[in-house]
Each structure stands twice: as C-alpha cells, then as structure tokens.
C-alpha cells in the first residue's frame, strides 16, 4: 500500500508527492549517486524477531533535506513522522547522522530501506537491507505411538524459523554413539525391532537461538520370551520355589502346569505369585509327589511360550541342572486342560 493509503488528509498526500519530486525519487526507483561515500547507510542489518533494529545514515553539512523510506513509503522526513506505525521512531537527526529505530521487529519488516538526501546540487540515496532472523520452533510432531514388532513406523517433525532450521532425529534409549541419527523431517523405521523402542528426540536448529527439542515415545509390542527358568533341588519337608522370568510387551500373564493339570494358589499346598516379569511357584512343604516337571506358560496378545522346570530331590540326576529346558509350543488352553507339543533346545 502506498503512503497515501495510510494518510487521512489530502494535503499530506500532496506533501508526500512534493517530497518525492523534491528528492527526485520516483516510486520504487532509487536515485544512484556517483559519490559512494555520501550519504552512507549501514551494511545489511540483521536482528532477531522481537528485537529493535537501528538504521543509521551518515551525512554532512551539504544536506538540506533528508528522509528514510521503506521501499516507496516514507517513514520519516527530517523530524516529521509519516509512518503510522508506532514502532518506528527517530533516534538521531544531526548534521552528521540521521537514524531511525524499528522496535519489536517482525518478519514483515524485512526488506530494503533507503536513506534519501537532498543537497544543493543533487539528490542522493543509500540503501540498507534489514534481515529478520526467527528462532527455530517445532510446529508439528508425531504423537507417542505403539506398534507391533516388524511393523513400519514413520515419525514427523515440522519446524519453522529463519534461516530454515535443520531437523534432526535421534534415538535416546541407547548408549551414546550406538543410536542412529536422521537429518530429515521424517524418520522412517522399517521392520522395527524391540530394541528400537523408547524415546526419539527431534531437534530443530538454525543457530539463531537454542534448538527447539521435542520427544516422541515408541512402544514396540512383541510376544513373550522366557529369559530365565532354573531347575530347583529341595528335600522332602522343606520349602521349594520354582521361578520363571519372561520378557514381553505387553507384559506377559503366567500359568503353571504339572503334566496336563493347571495349578492354582491354595491347591495342593502351592502358591503362585506374579510380579512384573517374574512368576514363582512355591511349595511350602515338599512331598515325594511334588517332584517332577512343571511347565511355566507366558502369554500376551501376540503369542505365548513356555519352559519346562524340574523340582527334584537329593541325589537326583538332572540333565542341565543349571538351566531348565525351554520350548516353542503350540498351545490350546481351555479350562484346566493343557495340551502342548515341545520343540526343546
């Protein structure tokens, strides 16, 4: 919009036109001077969004009239303010310097500014370009997500800023130097594995201010895997405990069987306790009939697995006494009936 669009009085428009004619500065066409040292405006001015920008113009006693323009709009002519923007103020108007300030600078203030002077002989101009920098800001980022193992995952992180920020993704839930880094708005993970679960950090950086950082959590579901199951030896009349530990997401539910019979707390003097990843089967007073093989079954919505654990008495010879046999199994669970096929290893 031209300057007359901002003014309410026709005579002011006439004065502006007169100023342009007086300075011989047609709209949008600054006059060039052969004297490169006069007037002398600053080099390009770079400020951050929200700061104040000072535009200085060096002049001398040959100057009879002086003005600051933004493109074709006069901001100040001498001490007279023509801009209706309250953020624009005059700082210095002396025989050697003519300076204005733009407060609380925003991106729309960026562009060319012209110092125009009139001497006894010729009109002269000098131009400065205002550059507005904007700190990085993440505007849109993916929400926390839960997926099944072997799925594909795409995370999005959109950021703005001036200069345009660099967006980097980093996996936080691994040791330093072991996680992968992606310099892109999109992070794509194909056939995601359980060890790729955890927090992912998006960082937007453009060196204007501290990076903007946000995090996304990926939860990877996977079927149970029995990581620890140990055979136990105990004498008749003593307390015996069989323990079974399973890793799974969601957390596994446990069941205990002896042959085809499902065990329950309070039956035959046993107690079953499930705490997190560990399930224990406790015998408070072991008898001869308690000796034998027990099966721990761990189940979640993605599948199940089991391990065979032996409770044995003194002098018994057990293969692999330090670890129970594990098995991949096909299971049918219905009431107390338990059928299975083992592939032992």
UniProtKB/Swiss-Prot annotation:
Signal peptide: 1-27
GO biological process assignments: cell adhesion; negative regulation of glial cell proliferation; positive regulation of cell size; positive regulation of synapse assembly
Pfam families xrefs: I-set, ig, Ig_3
GO cellular component: apical dendrite; dendritic spine; neuronal cell body; plasma membrane; postsynaptic density; side of membrane
Principal location class: membrane
Membrane topology: Lipid-anchor; GPI-anchor
Homology family: Belongs to the immunoglobulin superfamily. IgLON family.
Protein's UniProt name: Opioid-binding protein/cell adhesion molecule
Organism name: Rattus norvegicus (Rat)
Primary gene name: Opcml
């Amino acid at each position: 919009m031209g300057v007359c669009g901002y003014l309410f009085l026709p005579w002011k428009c006439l004065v502006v036109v007169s100023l342009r004619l007086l300075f011989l500065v047609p709209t949008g066409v600054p006059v060039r001077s052969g004297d490169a040292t006069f007037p002398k405006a600053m080099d390009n001015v770079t400020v951050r969004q929200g700061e104040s920008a000072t535009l200085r113009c060096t002049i001398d006693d040959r100057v009879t009239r002086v003005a600051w323009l933004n493109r074709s709009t006069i901001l100040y002519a001498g001490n007279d303010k023509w801009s209706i923007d309250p953020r624009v103020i005059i700082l210095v108007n002396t025989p050697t310097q003519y300076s204005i300030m733009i407060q609380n600078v925003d991106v729309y203030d960026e562009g060319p500014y012209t110092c125009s002077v009139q001497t006894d002989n010729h009109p002269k101009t000098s131009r400065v370009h205002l550059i507005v920098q904007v700190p990085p800001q993440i505007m849109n980022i993916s929400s926390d997500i839960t997926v099944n193992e072997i799925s594909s995952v795409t995370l999005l992180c959109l950021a703005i800023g001036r200069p345009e920020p660099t967006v980097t993704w980093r996996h936080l839930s691994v040791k330093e130097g072991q996680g992968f880094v992606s310099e892109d708005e999109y992070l794509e993970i194909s056939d995601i594995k359980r060890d790729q679960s955890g927090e992912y950090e998006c960082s937007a950086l453009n060196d204007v201010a501290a990076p903007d950082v946000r995090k996304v959590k990926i939860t990877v579901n996977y079927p149970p895997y029995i990581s620890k199951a140990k055979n136990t030896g105990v004498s008749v009349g003593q307390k015996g405990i069989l323990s079974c530990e399973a890793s799974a997401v969601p957390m596994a539910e446990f069941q205990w069987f002896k042959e085809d019979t499902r065990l329950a707390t309070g039956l035959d003097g046993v107690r079953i306790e499930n705490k997190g990843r560990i399930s224990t089967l406790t015998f408070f007073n072991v008898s001869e009939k308690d000796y034998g093989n027990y099966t721990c079954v761990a189940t979640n919505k993605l599948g199940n697995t089991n391990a065979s654990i032996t409770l044995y008495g003194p002098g018994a010879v057990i293969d692999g006494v330090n670890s129970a046999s594990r098995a991949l199994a096909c299971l049918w669970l219905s009431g107390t009936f338990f059928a299975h096929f083992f592939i032992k290893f």
